Amino acid sequence: EESIAFLRDAAAINRYYETVAERIAPQLPENAHVCDAGCGVGELSLALKPYCHHVTAVDADALAIKTLKAHLIEGVTARCGDMEALAPEKPYDAMVFCLFGRTQDTLRIAKKQCRGRIFLVKRDYSHHRFSAGKVSLGEYTAGSTENVLREKGIPYTVEHFTAEFGQPFRSLEAAERFFALYNRSESEVLSKDEIRARLTAGPSAEFPYYLPHKKALCLFTIETAAISKEEAV
């Protein structure tokens, strides 16, 4: 699937996943078994491995898990299926939810499956970046997460940071396909000239075009002990 190819190209030339892992690493217990929930193609799982004993990467997308399995390293296990149905035999020491799931759902899953800290990585902006018009991200934002945690009285720490995760392209046609794939606007599309105006010179002969994207993110850290048992229902 082309979306996976785009993602792997972006991961290969940016330190995005390494940057996220470096923010989480100091807060991980020693020799931890970490779950990367909604791992996608597993780039963050691989980036987390140097900082822990084992990473279990879970995603419901069979193609994403197949892609990860083709690039597995020692100490990373890939599992395909629904997060709630794939509970570990022993609770995880930590769980990471990177741009995955509604906050209420992650709290419920974590209370059942984790005995330590959970890390929620959320977008620190409100609108979709690759759409023609203004398309809201709704509840999948840092602001929404803060509202939920405050409402439930769950203590947390939060760290704001940025990580470059631009998209390289092999051709202008690839850039056009990218915007067609990720445009969430129901009525508007970007013209070829508008797409070209967003691009800069690429990093190499293989990728002559580049779409810059400095991603503003928030890292929420929560102790599962602070999540009430009612959240697990």
Please name every model-derived segment.
Residues 41-82:
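Class I SAM-dependent methyltransferase SAM/SAH-binding core
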Residues 93-106:
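A short SAM/SAH-binding and catalytic strip from SAM-dependent methyltransferases
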Residues 160-233:
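Conserved Class I S-adenosyl-L-methionine
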Residues 1-16:
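Class I SAM-dependent methyltransferase Rossmann-like catalytic core
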Residues 138-153, 157-159:
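Short alpha-helix
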Residues 115-128:
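Conserved beta-strand signature within the Rossmann-like core of class I S-adenosyl-L-methionine
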Residues 14-31:
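Conserved alpha-helix/loop element of class I SAM-dependent methyltransferases that forms part
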Residues 31-40:
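Conserved class I S-adenosyl-L-methionine
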